[in-house]
């Protein structure tokens, strides 16, 4: 039992004695939490007046602080969260702010430019507020207990701020990738793609069907990725939805290749690209599926114009396909991120 107790104290860093001091003092002052929360917030702004700029409801307000209608509910929310997290810290073994709320706190603090020194200000304001509320109970051990509890919550928020920062870096990387798309597509590659497309586009209807049929010859399980084929007993060539879908995909791929150098980027409209990313993510498309479509595209074009086909033309079409695939993958990554965020925001049962 004693060993378990030591393990718990080591992992949480919050002792039984600290827990008792925090609980005792919170019980003595929580009935007055409305007034204390306002005092706490006013103290923050007295210690660090520029911090006012971090709150949207205070930034451009000319109303005296105590008359601002949004201050009290916000102050109450922050003060209660801080104190109740402290009270639950040892029992729960962790900061008890709900994960989705903690994530939101991290994102908000990161967005508003909160720094480590701001957490030191809230810590000072919290300790002074509690000391003034219960001077007869205040002494160094209690101060240390509340400071430790505050730091635990601050560290949890900082961890989420770092996550928000990393996600922004990732998003910027995707944007840079998208902005640089097309820059490595040479004039020679463009000429080869345009020349070959002009030679085959009048036959694009037949080629698109051939393109799609070959996908399922190489990778039969890929059929399961398409709702209109998944549960269909109709022969592939008789499926009424196959032809328009095949035409749409084949034309988009080829026309995107033709426009790639001129536009400097994949020319699928942003909304369609976003939809493509979401659909591909939802359907479970993987990197290997893009390799299949690349192989099939190259084989289809090669068979359509064998007399023009060359290694240089193969490389040009391969590069154009990869640029489109990378743009779709970037949107799939965003869709995955949005999905994870939605899952985390759902309350656990």
Swiss-Prot record:
EC number(s) from the headed UniProt entry: 1.7.2.-
Primary enzyme class: oxidoreductase
GO process annotations (BP): response to nitric oxide
GO CC aspect terms: cytoplasm; nucleus
Keyword Signal: no
Main location, first listed in the record: cytoplasm
Manner of cofactor binding, per the entry note: Binds 2 heme groups per subunit.
Induction (record text): Regulated by nitric oxide (NO), particularly during nodulation mediated by Sinorhizobium meliloti inoculation.
Catalytic reaction list: Fe(III)-heme b-[protein] + nitric oxide + H2O = Fe(II)-heme b-[protein] + nitrite + 2 H(+)
GO molecular function: heme binding; metal ion binding; oxidoreductase activity; oxygen binding; oxygen carrier activity
Pfam families xrefs: Globin (PF00042)
UniProt keyword annotation of Zinc present: no
Co-factor(s): heme b
Locations listed in the record: Cytoplasm; Nucleus
Residues given in the record as heme b 1 binding sites: 56, 70, 74, 104, 108-109
Alphabetical keyword list: Cytoplasm, Heme, Iron, Metal-binding, Nucleus, Oxidoreductase, Oxygen transport, Transport
Gene3D superfamilies recorded: Globins
Domain Globin: 13-162, 184-333
Annotated heme b 2 binding sites: 227, 241, 245, 275, 279-280
Protein function: Phytoglobin that regulates the fine tuning of nitric oxide (NO) concentration in the cytosol in response to sudden changes in O(2) availability, and performs both symbiotic and nonsymbiotic functions. Exhibits NO dioxygenase activity in the presence of O(2) but nitrite reductase (NiR) activity in the absence of O(2) (e.g. during flooding or in waterlogged soil). May not function as an oxygen storage or transport protein.
Subunit structure, interactors included: Monomer.
Family: Belongs to the plant globin family.
Protein name: Anaerobic nitrite reductase Glb1-3
Species this protein is from: Medicago truncatula (Barrel medic)
Gene name of the encoded protein: Glb1-3
């Amino acid at each position: 039992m004693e060993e378990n107790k030591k393990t718990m104290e080591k992992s949480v860093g919050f002792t039984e004695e600290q827990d008792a001091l925090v609980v005792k003092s919170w019980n003595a002052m929580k009935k007055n939490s409305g007034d204390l929360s306002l005092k706490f917030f006013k103290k923050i702004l007295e210690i660090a007046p520029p911090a006012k700029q971090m709150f949207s409801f205070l930034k451009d307000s000319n109303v005296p602080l105590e008359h601002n209608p949004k201050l009290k509910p916000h102050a109450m929310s922050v003060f209660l969260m801080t104190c109740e997290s402290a009270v639950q810290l040892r029992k729960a073994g962790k900061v008890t702010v709900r994960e989705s709320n903690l994530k939101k706190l991290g994102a908000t603090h990161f967005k508003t430019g909160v720094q480590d020194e701001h957490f030191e200000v809230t810590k000072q304001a919290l300790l002074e507020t509690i000391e003034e509320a219960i001077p007869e109970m205040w002494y160094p051990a209690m101060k240390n207990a509340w400071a430790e509890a505050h730091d635990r919550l601050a560290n949890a928020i900082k961890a989420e701020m770092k996550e928000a920062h990393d996600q922004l870096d990732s998003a910027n990387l995707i944007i840079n990738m998208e902005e640089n798309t097309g820059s490595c597509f040479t004039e020679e590659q463009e000429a080869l793609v345009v020349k070959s497309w002009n030679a085959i586009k009048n036959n694009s209807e037949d080629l698109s069907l051939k393109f799609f049929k070959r996908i399922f010859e190489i990778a039969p399980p890929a059929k399961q990725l398409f709702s209109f084929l998944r549960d269909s007993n109709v022969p592939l060539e008789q499926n009424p939805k196959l032809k328009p879908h095949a035409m749409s995909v084949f034309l988009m791929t080829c026309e995107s290749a033709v426009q790639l150098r001129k536009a400097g980027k994949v020319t699928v409209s942003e909304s369609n690209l976003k939809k493509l990313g979401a659909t591909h993510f939802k359907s479970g498309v993987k990197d290997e599926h893009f390799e299949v479509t690349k192989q099939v595209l190259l084989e289809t074009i090669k068979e359509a114009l064998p007399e023009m086909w060359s290694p240089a033309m193969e490389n040009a079409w391969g590069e154009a396909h990869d640029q489109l695939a990378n743009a779709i993958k970037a949107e799939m990554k965003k869709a995955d991120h949005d999905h994870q965020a939605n899952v985390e925001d759902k309350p656990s049962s």
